[in-house]
């Protein structure tokens, strides 16, 4: 028999509140949290995976607030770009991708070359070497012979003088596959500027198109020459690899280019130099080239070029399903996490759904939040308590454990989680008076790990599990299974007796007797 539901149902997200070993560096176990511990002792609870493959990230990668809220709100694993592309390589769909295959075939049909340009490192922030190697495989499968790599050097997400090793790896891969050669190298300072320093982008573009730059007979020679001038990877000036005194390859009419960076912000300027018709940031040698240019992901909606992996459109996310049931909902957070309970929770959609109200509580104006660990948690609490009776569903975020956790100040993090616990107590009491259900969870870990093994401050997120507590007297005897963030939305719908849409692949955490 279905359990009657009193309104509102509240989903409370404690940002950066993970489950870690008790110890001196764990602000959560060190803090006085009587309300949180009382809920753990008295109500059904479980643990959720909030990092790595469970939230669409590479295995072992820590979670974050954007990804956490995206998965919670979507009710399914939302694969991030890096993971989506790597998954496509594994399942083979990469090699039938229309945009990528189209670029390779266009080069073949026009008697042109394929140019693969992007960041060559294993930093995993902007690009991935596996994606470059898969593009080489695709070109070989399609029978293309002339394939050239334009290697942008990192030195930021990896050590500052590590490029030689990555270039050797790429050259080894080219030899093993029997396809591809490095034609230019340059630091990301030039090729990946995002601050409208167009003179930098111009130097990168002219090296790629006109062969302008330092000359070297091999990538290793170019790197050596740069290091001798005390210029490390990020700042390596554009260098052109030559054969018999001429550039090995430049981008020409009839060629195809694939920009294999998956992160958008630092790929936009160079892309615009290639594809924009009314480009006026600098003079392009020979004007706009007639080439096939493909972006690996969508760098900007206004860029006129094919995209191999366009943004995912998430249908039937939790907010949409709640709206479709005719229910009123509230999203409330302070400034630091407002986008997370709105844009990210709604699957990357800016517009509210019908019946969805949003309330932003300003975050305090301090340089760092260890100066005010309470942040605006009490103000968020005051505001939500005033509005409990106006809504059917409320999503609330407390930012403190994450934002104060990032400062590395253990005492401040303890004060932060103690403030949140005080607020939990006030909200739980008000919800209990209404016999309304409260679901308490987190998006990723942070405050439970404030010390490195050597005693230094730890300021990053963690890969730890996060709590999930079902606070409702009618479910006191219920059992909950372990799961992942994708299972939160189906649990909300289960309690509200709303049909779970097929697009949600998560499952309710409530074990059916």
UniProtKB/Swiss-Prot annotation:
Residues holding Mn(2+) 2: 15, 65, 443-444
Q: From the UniProt record, give one GO term of the biological process aspect.
A: glucose catabolic process
Which InterPro entries does UniProt cross-reference here?
Alkaline_phosphatase_core_sf, BPG-indep_PGM_N, Metalloenzyme, PGAM_B_sf, Pgm_bpd_ind
Q: What is an example of a GO molecular function annotated in this UniProt entry?
A: manganese ion binding
- How would you classify this enzyme at the top EC level? isomerase
**One Pfam family linked to the record:** Metalloenzyme
SUPFAM superfamilies (UniProt xref): 2,3-Bisphosphoglycerate-independent phosphoglycerate mutase, substrate-binding domain (SSF64158), Alkaline phosphatase-like (SSF53649)
The residues annotated as the active site are: 65
Assembly information from the UniProt record: Monomer.
**Would you tell me the protein name for this molecule?**
2,3-bisphosphoglycerate-independent phosphoglycerate mutase
């Amino acid at each position: 028999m279905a359990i009657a539901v009193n309104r509102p149902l509240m989903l409370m997200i404690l940002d950066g509140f993970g489950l870690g070993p008790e110890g001196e560096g764990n602000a959560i176990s060190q803090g006085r949290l009587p309300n949180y511990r009382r809920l753990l002792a008295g109500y059904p609870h479980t643990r959720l995976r909030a990092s790595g493959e469970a939230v669409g990230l590479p295995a072992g990668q820590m979670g974050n607030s954007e990804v956490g809220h995206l998965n919670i709100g979507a009710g399914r694993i939302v694969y991030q770009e890096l993971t989506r592309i790597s998954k496509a390589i594994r399942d083979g769909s990469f090699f039938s991708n229309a945009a990528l295959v189209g670029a390779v075939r266009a080069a073949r049909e026009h008697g042109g070359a394929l140019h693969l340009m992007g960041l060559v490192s294993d930093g995993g922030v902007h690009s991935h070497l596996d994606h470059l190697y898969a593009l080489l495989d695709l070109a070989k499968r399609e029978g293309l012979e002339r394939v050239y790599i334009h290697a942008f050097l990192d030195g930021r997400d990896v050590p500052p003088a590590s490029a030689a090793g990555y270039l050797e790896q790429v050259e080894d891969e080219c030899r093993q596959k029997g396809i591809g050669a490095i034609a230019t190298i340059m630091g990301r300072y030039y090729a990946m500027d995002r601050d409208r320093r167009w003179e930098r982008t111009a130097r990168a573009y002219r090296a790629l198109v006109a062969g302008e730059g330092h000359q070297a007979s091999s990538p290793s020679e170019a790197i050596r020459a740069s290091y001798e001038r005390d210029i490390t990877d990020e700042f390596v000036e554009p260098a052109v690899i030559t054969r018999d005194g001429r550039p090995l390859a430049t981008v020409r009419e009839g060629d195809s280019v694939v920009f294999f960076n998956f992160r958008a912000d630092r790929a936009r300027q160079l892309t615009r130099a290639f594809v924009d018709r009314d480009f006026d940031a600098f003079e392009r040698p020979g004007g706009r080239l007639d080439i096939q240019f493909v972006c690996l992901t969508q760098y900007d909606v206004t860029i006129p070029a094919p995209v191999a992996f366009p943004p995912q459109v998430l249908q039937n996310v939790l907010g949409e399903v709640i709206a479709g049931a005719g229910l009123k909902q509230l999203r409330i957070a302070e400034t630091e996490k407002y986008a997370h309970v709105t844009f990210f929770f709604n699957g990357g959609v800016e517009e509210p759904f019908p019946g969805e109200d949003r309330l932003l509580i300003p975050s305090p104006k301090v340089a760092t939040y260890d100066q005010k660990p309470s942040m605006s948690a009490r103000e968020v609490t005051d505001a939500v308590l005033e509005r409990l009776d106006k809504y059917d569903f409320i999503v609330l975020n407390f930012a403190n454990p994450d934002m104060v956790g990032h400062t590395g100040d253990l005492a401040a993090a303890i004060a932060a989680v103690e403030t949140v616990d005080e607020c939990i107590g006030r909200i739980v009491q008000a919800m209990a008076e209404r016999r309304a259900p409260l679901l308490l969870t987190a998006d990723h870990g942070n405050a439970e790990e404030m010390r490195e093994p050597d005693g230094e401050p730890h300021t990053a997120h963690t890969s730890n599990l996060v709590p999930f507590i079902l606070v409702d007297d009618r479910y006191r005897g219920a059992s909950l299974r372990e799961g992942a963030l994708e299972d939160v939305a189906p649990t909300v719908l289960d309690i509200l007796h709303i049909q779970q849409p097929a697009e949600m692949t998560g499952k309710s955490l409530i074990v059916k007797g």
